[in-house]
């Protein structure tokens, strides 16, 4: 693993007890979460992907979550999410897909997802049979693409994602059309006032998942705009963010056993 110099010093530790939650989700209060800059090679065999890895410390192997960020805002808000997942007892990889720009073609997205998944599977402290993906905004589209391409993913969580690509986006597979390829528990967390991904579209996605008999849950937050869960996004809403991460933690604890830590590791 080659360390990169980008915003965070490699190996720096963060104490995150303030975000440990209310006991309804997995986690340990006041633990040190190490975040380091890493790089790995895309599935195309040539492109380097600068990313961040959060490690919960203690004894592994751990379940792991691949974080697929949105377009807007700096990495900082997503690094905080990786730290939070580390605090819950997961290894978390913040995938640096924006090295491709803000709207890469699907072929590059799939290549880079392959590189990220290969990196996670080969990480010595990760249990390769316990992998999940969190997608935010545009990364929510990528999360559904990952679920179709990687059958070893056990859980998918999408925060303020899309049922259909924005009109200004590059043409590609529609999330709505990826529904049939989702065979694992899916949680969608969405605002009723999402100006980029209308509520009606997401309700249509919900109905399709139900018609297909998919193990999907949809949670809607009244009056909340796009980007509500990410602190550095213009649409951030603290109450909805807290509620959505409580839901995500509950969902992981239910569908990805072994995330909670016990005994001397608490």
Where do the language-model regions lie?
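Alpha/beta-hydrolase fold nucleophile elbow
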Residues: 125-136
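Gly/Ala-rich beta-loop-alpha elbow adjacent to hydrolase catalytic centers
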Residues: 135-139, 143
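Conserved alpha/beta-hydrolase "acid-adjacent" motif
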Residues: 196-201
